[in-house]
């Protein structure tokens, strides 16, 4: 039984088609990474899944009793507003101190409860946002460009924490990124989106490949991997995805 089923989903903003006939499903406990260029409809897909936008065609079906946790791409907090992490996590549902402590521990920032939001680093703030999403004990965790603005080491650390969250809680994870060449090595599936589903498959884990180490750097603990784009079709609408040749070009450039 799937947690979420997306069947033939099409979205339009005015006269512009953002998504066309997208179908996918998320099973309990799996990690799915959606990759694609800017403007490919990734965030729109997430918004449709959480019910923030209505489909033009198709439907999104959520399993009975399935709960979602959502980490947005960005959240602006007034830096002049004095607010501790604990106070932020209590809004708006009034989470208990025990629930806050557990969520912060699961996000890997147990000691930040009394810290001011305005004083957090980008990586710490993303962990706090993750903790906020985990308070409700979601069946499916959705993350929209969760590592945007983080350096490579920070991104790898965050990905590793997501793997730990899945192991600890059993929740499924749906992550999106615009970086076609970087995905979680722990992903069960990778879906390439560019207005429609271009392709999907498992990511290649490349821990020992020197050219990929040169591209992604060291110290990532295998959390970053390369997804090779190999398509057997041509696109009849939207701009084309970044295919295998583009990936190879990036690798050569990095060397």
UniProtKB/Swiss-Prot annotation:
Assigned EC number: 7.2.2.20
GO annotations of cellular component type: plasma membrane
GO molecular function ontology, one term from the record: ATP hydrolysis activity
Coiled-coil annotated spans: none
UniProt region (Disordered), positions on chain: 234-255
Domain ABC transporter: 4-219
GO BP of this protein: response to zinc ion
InterPro entries listed in its UniProt record: AAA+_ATPase, ABC_transporter-like_ATP-bd, ABC_transporter-like_CS, Metal_Ion_Import_ABC, P-loop_NTPase
Catalytic activity reported: Zn(2+)(out) + ATP(in) + H2O(in) = Zn(2+)(in) + ADP(in) + phosphate(in) + H(+)(in)
Binding site for ATP: 36-43
Domain of life (superkingdom): Bacteria
Localization per Swiss-Prot or TrEMBL: Cell inner membrane
Keywords: ATP-binding, Cell inner membrane, Cell membrane, Ion transport, Membrane, Nucleotide-binding, Translocase, Transport, Zinc, Zinc transport
Enzyme class, first EC level, given as a word: translocase
Membrane topology note: Peripheral membrane protein
Cross-referenced Gene3D superfamilies: P-loop containing nucleotide triphosphate hydrolases
Subunit and partners: The complex is composed of two ATP-binding proteins (ZnuC), two transmembrane proteins (ZnuB) and a solute-binding protein (ZnuA).
Family of this protein: Belongs to the ABC transporter superfamily. Zinc importer (TC 3.A.1.15.5) family.
Function statement: Part of the ABC transporter complex ZnuABC involved in zinc import. Responsible for energy coupling to the transport system.
Protein known as: Zinc import ATP-binding protein ZnuC
Organism: Roseobacter denitrificans (strain ATCC 33942 / OCh 114)
């Amino acid at each position: 039984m799937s947690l979420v089923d997306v069947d033939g989903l099409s979205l339009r903003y005015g006269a512009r088609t953002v998504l066309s006939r997208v179908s996918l499903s998320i099973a309990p406990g799996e990690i799915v990474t959606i990759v694609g260029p800017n403007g490919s409809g990734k965030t729109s897909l997430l918004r449709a899944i959480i019910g923030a936008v209505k489909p033009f065609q198709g439907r999104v079906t959520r399993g009975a009793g399935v709960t979602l946790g959502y980490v947005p791409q960005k959240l602006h907090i007034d830096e002049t507003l004095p607010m501790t992490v604990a106070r932020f996590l209590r809004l708006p549902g009034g989470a208990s101190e025990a629930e806050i402590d557990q969520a912060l521990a699961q996000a890997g920032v147990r000691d930040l409860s009394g810290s001011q939001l305005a004083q957090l680093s980008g990586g710490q703030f993303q962990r706090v946002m993750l903790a906020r999403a985990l308070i409700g004990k979601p069946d499916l965790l959705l993350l929209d460009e969760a590592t945007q603005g983080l350096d490579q080491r920070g991104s790898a650390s965050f990905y590793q924490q997501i793997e730990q969250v899945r192991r600890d809680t059993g929740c499924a994870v749906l992550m999106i990124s615009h970086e076609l060449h970087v995905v979680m090595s722990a992903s069960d599936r990778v879906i390439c989106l560019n207005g429609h589903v271009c392709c999907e498959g498992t990511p290649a884990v490349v821990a020992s490949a020197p050219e990929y180490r040169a591209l992604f750097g060291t110290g990532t603990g295998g959390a970053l991997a390369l997804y090779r784009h190999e398509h057997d079709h041509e696109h009849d609408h939207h701009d084309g995805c970044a295919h295998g040749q583009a990936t190879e070009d990036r690798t050569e450039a990095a060397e």
